[in-house]
Amino acid sequence: MKDYIEKIKAIGYSKIIEESDDHVIAKGGEILVHIIRTDEKELTPRLVNTIVTKLLVLDPVPNYAWITNGEANSYQDVMFAKAIPEIPAPLTREEEKLFGRKEITKRDKWSYLMYEKLQTRFDQLHQLIYDSRDSVDNTNDAIDEFCKLIFMEEFRINHPDYKLKKGVLAGKKIKDLLWHERFEKDDADKKAIVEEIRTAFKEIKDHPDYVAHLDDGTEAPIFDPDSYLKLGKVEIYYKVLKALQDLGDISTNGTTRQATLNDLSGDVLGRVFDVLIRGKFENKGGMGIYLTPRQVTEAAVDMVMHDLKKSPGKITKLDIHNRPEFKVLDGCCGSGGFLIKMLEELKQYLLIELAGDRKQWEERFEKMKEHSIVGADNSPGMILKARINMALHGANRAQIFKTENSLTSPQLKPETFDVILTNPPFKSGGISEKSSEGKTTLQFFRNDIEDGVNQKRSTGLSLGSKPDGKGKWKPVSSMDPAILFIDRYLQLLKPGGLCMMVVPDGVLSNSGDRYVREYLMGKKNEITGEFEGGKAILKGVISLPQETFSLSGAGAKTSLLYFKKKEHPGEKQGSVFMAVADEVGFTVKNKIEVQLGDDHNSLLKIIDSYKRGH
C-alpha cells in the first residue's frame, strides 16, 4: 500500500492513522479517508456498495473511501454513498465548520450491517426462482415473481391486522397467513398454504395504499388486473418468506424484538433491490427493453440537480392544495432508474434545506414521493419493477403507470413538468404510417402545422412533419421515435423546465435532421450571431462511447442532450456545454458488462467540470 500512501499524502492527507496490507486510514485536518484494497477482479456496484455500507458503521464515519484492486479505482463520498471523480484535498478549518456530518443512529448501523446479508439473500432467492423453472422462462420473469413476494411481505408488515374478506380465507389475518413458520409444522399441508398465499395475493394486490392517483383522477395500481402468483413450489415460498422475515432481533427504546424489513433505515432495502435488478436483468434490445447504465443516470441527475439548486423555491413550492408543485417525469421509465436517483437526490436536498425541522421534512418528502415523481412505460414487467423499486424506497404510491404510448397518452398533460429525465427508444423510421397506430401517432404530431407553416406554439407538436426545400412543412410517412419524444417533451415541460435525454447521435449531426436541431434551438442569424425561432435553450451535449448501450443491441452511438424549454420566445441562447465521454466505467466483452472502476468513468469529471463552470 506504499504507493497509495504516497499518493494520499500528496493530496494533503499527511497523517497516517492506521496501515495494513489492504487498509489505510489517512487524515487531513478533520477529514478521514479510508483506502481499501480488494482482491476482486471487478469493482462491481455490489462490491462498492458493500464496502461503503461497512464504513458507515464505523465511529467516526470516514468522509471518503478510495477502493482499489490495483488496476481499477472507485472514489466514494461515504456519507452519501456517491461516486466522486477523485479524492479531494482536505478542507480548510473554515470549510470544515460548514462541512457538517450526517448523524448515524443505532438503527442505521444495524441496517448497514444487514446490507450485505440481504444482498446475498436476494441473489440466492432470485437464483432459486430462476433455477426452479416454476412457470418462469428467464431471469426477468424470476425478478417479477420475486417482486410479488416482496410486495406480500411488505403488505404483511404494514397491515398486520388486515383480515381477508373473500372466499374461504375470509376473516384470516394476513400476518398469520404469510408467516414462514407455518411451513415448519409437522402436520402442515404445505401445498394448501401455498394456495392460500396465491389466493390472498389476488385480493390484496389492488389495496388502496399501493394505488397511485394520477393528476387526471385515474387510479394506477402496481399490478395488472390479470396478475397472479405464478410460482407453485413449496420450497420457493418457504425459503423466500424465511429469508425476508428471519432478520434477527433489534433493540428499540430499550426493548428487544424481532426485526422486519421496515426496520431498515434510509434506502438500504431499495439499494439492495436496485443492485439485484441491475445485476440480474437481461437486456432485450430487440424489444426495446434495456436498462440505462447506472453511470449515465447518476451523471444526468447530478447535472440537473446542480441547476435546480440555483432556484430552490422551485423544488419546495406548494400549490393551493398544499401539495408539491414540482414534478419530474420519465415517459419511458423502465425499472425507474432515473426516477429512483432523482428521488434520492431530492431527499438529500430537502434534508439540507429543511435542516432542524424533522417533522416538516418528513411531511414534505412524503408528499413529494406521492405527487412529484411520474413515470410511464408500455411494458407491464418494467412498470412492476419500477413500482416495487419505488415502494422499497418508501414511495408506495408514486405516479408510475402503464400506458400504451407515452407519445400520445392523455394522462401526460402539457406544461406540467419541471424536469424530464429519460432514455426513449430510437430507431430510424420506427414509427410508420404503415400501421394504424403509427399513422395516428404521426397525425398527433402535426397539430401545430397550419397551411404548411409551423406555428411553434408552446404546447404545439410539429415533428410528424418536416420542412421541404422551400420551408413548407409537410407530413412524413415515418419518423424515429427519439425525434418525436423531443417534440413531446418540449410540450410536456413547463416554461423554464429542464430535459435531459439520451438521443442517437444522428439527431445531432445528420444533415437530414438539421431541421430538428433548428426546431429545438432556432436558426443562426448570420448578422447578429443569435439563434432565432427555437423552442428551447440548448444547455449541453455529452457524447457517450459506443459501448454505453451495446448490451441493448441498439448499436447506435448516443449522446446526452440537455435543454431548457424557453420561458418566453425572445429568450436568448447562451453558450453550450460540450463534452466527450471516452469511457463510462465499464466495457462489454462477450456480451458481458465488465466494470472498470470510476477512474475509467469520464462522466464523473465531465459533470464536475460542468458544475465548476455553471
Give, region by region, the residue ranges found by the protein language model.
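Nucleic-acid nuclease catalytic cores
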Residues: 41-86
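A conserved structural/catalytic subdomain of Rossmann-like adenosyl-cofactor enzymes
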Residues: 45, 414, 418-614
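Long recognition/docking surfaces used for binding and targeting
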Residues: 151, 158-281
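Domain-level recognition of nuclease-like catalytic cores that cleave nucleotide substrates
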Residues: 70-108
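Active-site beta-strand-loop-beta-strand hairpin of nuclease catalytic cores
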Residues: 22-34, 82
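Non-catalytic accessory regions of SAM-dependent methyltransferases
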Residues: 98-164
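Conserved S-adenosyl-L-methionine
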Residues: 293-422, 427-439, 503-506, 516-517, ...
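Acidic-basic catalytic patches of nuclease active cores, encompassing PD-(D/E)XK
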Residues: 1-20, 27, 488, 524
